[in-house]
Amino acid sequence: MKELQTVLKNHFAIEFADKKLLETAFTHTSYANEHRLLKISHNERLEFLGDAVLQLLISEYLYKKYPKKPEGDLSKLRAMIVREESLAGFARDCQFDQFIKLGKGEEKSGGRNRDTILGDAFEAFLGALLLDKDVAKVKEFIYQVMIPKVEAGEFEMITDYKTHLQELLQVNGDVAIRYQVISETGPAHDKVFDVEVLVEGKSIGQGQGRSKKLAEQEAAKNAVEKGLDSCI
């Protein structure tokens, strides 16, 4: 953790008072499970907190930055900024991938490069930073790491397939769209989800992902790429 502390201090002017909290933010469930006797905490609760503060601060930024954008457009842009792949990219930019504590099995299976794990660690770090400092420090970090890419327009071209599919299907009126998990495979800390999207009870696309959200996006993408004529 000393190397991580050095990175945080040199690049972001961040020094944690509670070093244990920082360590927890970078501890994956697989590592904690392999060291149960040591009663090591993992980062899921901090991820929950970090997700909430991230949503708040990005929402505030977008609201002030784009005073003429409607709510729907703001929601889409926020979703692109805080999606798993985006957060994993920010984690790599900060070198966070080097410091995550993983179980041996997770390490061997390529967990250090997995977007789900990296995105979760990024959110957990934000949660830890909030507890150790305050929301102003979290905002400062986000504005240093994330906002420059937002202002460069890197997220405006990413397709939100769920929203795109909904817009295509509901052009002539409301249509019942539902996403359903077909199967879950793998250990608890590394599940793979298979999801199908149904319109009026009919399956129109399937997708797979390391989280339900990713699998739903893939299912929607599959439906869009098939073409609506084959969907309804």
From Swiss-Prot:
Entry keyword set: Cytoplasm, Endonuclease, Hydrolase, Magnesium, Metal-binding, mRNA processing, Nuclease, RNA-binding, rRNA processing, rRNA-binding, tRNA processing
Biological process terms in GO annotation: mRNA processing; regulation of gene expression; rRNA processing; tRNA processing
Chain ranges of the RNase III domain: 5-134
An example Gene Ontology molecular-function term: rRNA binding
InterPro entries reported for this sequence: dsRBD_dom, RNase_III, RNase_III_dom, RNase_III_sf
Requisite cofactors: Mg(2+)
UniProt-annotated binding residues for Mg(2+): E47, D120, E123
Catalytic activity: Endonucleolytic cleavage to 5'-phosphomonoester
Location of the active site: D51, E123
Gene Ontology CC: cytoplasm
Subcellular location per the Swiss-Prot or TrEMBL entry: Cytoplasm
Domain DRBM: 160-229
Xref: SUPFAM superfamilies: dsRNA-binding domain-like (SSF54768), RNase III domain-like (SSF69065)
Enzyme Commission no: 3.1.26.3
Function: Digests double-stranded RNA. Involved in the processing of primary rRNA transcript to yield the immediate precursors to the large and small rRNAs (23S and 16S). Processes some mRNAs, and tRNAs when they are encoded in the rRNA operon. Processes pre-crRNA and tracrRNA of type II CRISPR loci if present in the organism.
Entry's family note: Belongs to the ribonuclease III family.
Subunit structure: Homodimer.
Protein name: Ribonuclease 3
